[in-house]
Amino acid sequence: PGSQLVLFGETAHREVCKAALQKWITRKARMHLLPWLRSVSHELHLPFEDASIRRQKTRWGSCSATKTISLNCKLLFLPSHLVRYILIHELCHTIHLNHSRQFWSLVGSYEPDYRQLDDSLRDARLY
């Protein structure tokens, strides 16, 4: 209820429809995920430099050495508790650019159930 997507025009052309849908999803992701990332960043006092939305095949997100966070537009289709965990995970990479014990300790200080959430992400392709 509330939001709907209507495709019109040359809908017989599958690639045109696919491109329109991907553009719409990316725009929606930008509208919802980037403000959420800023909010969690502020809440946890973990600043980042820049953020973008991408269509990634194998990653939910990434963080560069310049503290630029990229989020996968497909996060829109995950339950909110998993998205929040991914936001925390990527924000912790602004401190530790690896998956060291220090990194996981930092993640755990913000999200004690991170192991269970990380396991849940293995099945996230089902969403």
Residue ranges of each PLM-predicted region?
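Walker B catalytic acidic pair
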Residues: 90
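Active-site-proximal or metal-binding-adjacent scaffold patches in catalytic folds
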Residues: 1-85, 94-127
